[in-house]
């Protein structure tokens, strides 16, 4: 059964970059599971299936790296070129904070309180997001790139729960809801 799950996991992870280039980061996040569980044999099987998926897509006529390069060229021909790299670097990091909300961002300051698996997941997701921002590939693609990673950064909010003050989490929940309402009311997007 474990090997079947490894094959299914590899097939799903292998499909990720073909659904959205933003899901390329999920390969790094997925490595947290075997690192924490210390089970590398199923990971090797899943990794082989990922490689086979990329090769199969290539044999079918879609080479991943050509698609990434075409996306970069299309971005270079668009209106985003008028903004400097540092703009996108700052905007991407700020918008990741907006996506996880005040509780998620606040939880990052106390991430050491989380247990080892949760802490590893959150830190690897944040690290993957920062590497993506530093690479400059995701300029102007915040909603597609960061949303999948934000789901793995948001558990940092669990670090805000103080066992001595069991009701403190309520204020973080209020802040999260208020931030969502403000963003939904104020933000206008052409998409």
Residue ranges of model-derived segments:
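Perimembrane helix-loop-helix junctions
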Residues: 1-7, 13, 24-49
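Signature aromatic-anchored transmembrane alpha helix within multi-pass, membrane-resident enzymes
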Residues: 48-51, 164-189
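Transmembrane-helix signature of polytopic, lipid-linked glycan biosynthesis machinery
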Residues: 125-141, 156-159, 180-189
């Amino acid at each position: 059964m474990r090997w079947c799950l490894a094959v299914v996991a590899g097939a799903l992870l292998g499909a990720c970059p073909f659904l959205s280039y933003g899901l390329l980061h999920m390969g790094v996040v997925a490595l947290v599971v075997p690192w924490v569980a210390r089970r590398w044999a199923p990971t090797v099987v899943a990794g082989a299936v990922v490689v086979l998926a990329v090769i199969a897509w290539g044999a079918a006529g879609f080479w991943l790296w050509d698609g990434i390069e075409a996306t970069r060229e299309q971005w270079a021909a668009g209106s985003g070129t008028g903004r400097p790299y540092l703009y996108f670097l700052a905007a991407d990091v700020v918008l990741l904070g907006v996506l996880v909300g005040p509780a998620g961002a606040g939880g990052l300051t106390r991430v050491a309180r989380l247990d080892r698996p949760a802490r590893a997941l959150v830190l690897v997701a944040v690290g993957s997001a920062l590497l993506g921002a530093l690479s400059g590939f995701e300029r102007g693609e915040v909603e597609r790139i960061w949303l999948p990673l934000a789901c793995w950064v948001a558990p940092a909010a669990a670090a805000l729960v103080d066992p001595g003050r069991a009701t403190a989490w309520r204020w973080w929940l209020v802040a999260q809801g208020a931030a969502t309402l403000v963003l939904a009311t104020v933000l206008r997007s052409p998409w």
